[in-house]
Design a protein with these regions (language model features):
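Flexible "arm" and connector segments at domain edges
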Residues: 1-84, 88-154
Length: 154
């Protein structure tokens, strides 16, 4: 099967690189890769030997757990950056389950954010206001409007 071929290929690469443990395989994932892609590759290497959640829902629960740990770290002046990283890592794992590229997903989210922000700014100008003169509540109302009007699914 295709899966067996892939497993054999991975074993050959492991021998070629003289990697004896799965940890060494993970450590060989280039640090020069974008962090989201590297995280996904490392997670895949762990999954290859069975260290993985059985279902997507379990991976999602892990995100909630990590968010709670970040909240606790913020309250207690703990390891905030570390906990934030754990959330990102857990989110990347969900992307692996859903078979989406986390870099592409984030790039699309950034574009969507900018488009919605542009809507707010243009709407403010039409009302003769600068954004700096508007309250957050006014901008939030325009943001909600932008979500509806700029939604390509409608």
């Amino acid at each position: 099967t295709a899966e067996e071929v892939l497993i054999n290929w991975e074993e050959l690469k492991k021998k070629e690189k003289r990697q004896e443990t799965q940890t060494e395989v993970m450590q060989s994932v280039p640090e020069a890769l974008p962090a989201l892609i590297r995280a996904r590759k490392v997670q895949k290497k762990a999954a290859d030997v069975g260290f993985d959640f059985p279902v997507t829902a379990d991976a999602m629960r892990k995100v909630y757990e990590e968010v709670q740990e970040l909240e606790q770290a913020v309250r207690e002046n703990g390891e905030i950056e570390e906990e934030f990283g754990d959330i990102l890592f857990a989110l990347v794992n969900i992307s692996r389950f859903l078979k989406i590229n986390p870099e592409f997903a984030l790039t699309k989210a950034i574009k969507k954010f900018i488009n919605r922000f542009e809507y707010i700014e243009k709407s403010a100008l039409l009302e003769g206001k600068a954004l700096s003169e508007m309250s957050l509540e006014e901008m939030d109302l325009l943001w909600d409007e932008a979500k509806i009007k700029l939604n390509p699914m409608q």
